Amino acid sequence: MLGGYFDFASPDASLLVSLLPALVHVRGVERLSVLVRLVGEESRAQRSGRELVLTRLVEVLLVEALRSAHGDDAPPGLLRGLADARLAVAIRHMHGHPARPWTMAQLAKKAALSRSAFFERFTRAVGMPPMEYLLAWRMSVAKDLLRRNELSVAEVAERVGYGSASTFSTAFSRYEGQSPGRFARQR
């Protein structure tokens, strides 16, 4: 048995982490066995570059463990959504183009599904409706941009799909419980 945790560098990895399973139980995956063995050997050795090698091995171990936990057996979340080839197309479009004024019909078309089938399938797989996920993704991107303090609130609003700073400020305040300006100052 191997236990561990990951500390994600992104200050707002909460959305993605909340959509990952808390526990991944894997059996009979040879690649994982090899990686676990390598992690054990490297952690016992006192060689130069040990920390760098361990960091990379553990990153690969995480990816392989998550890959093995996808599909219908996975709990609702991002992995299950990405494991569905049709939903994955829509998710990648949302992630790649958060400023686009997506509609349910457009996302369903990307997934080659009817609106009702897309809504049902997405909600069942990801654990939340598509437009709720899109809002959460946009707010996650906005928080990251605000933390950097490189853009005005209006520029952040434009990058995450809002036509005006005031509309964005209202949506952000409702979602986050504070204004974008205040959020940026606190970081």
List PLM regions with ranges:
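Short helix-capping/turn signature of helix-turn-helix
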Residues: R148-N149
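Basic/polar phosphate-binding segments, predominantly the helix-turn-helix DNA-binding elements
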Residues: V60, E64-H70, V89-S140, L145, ...
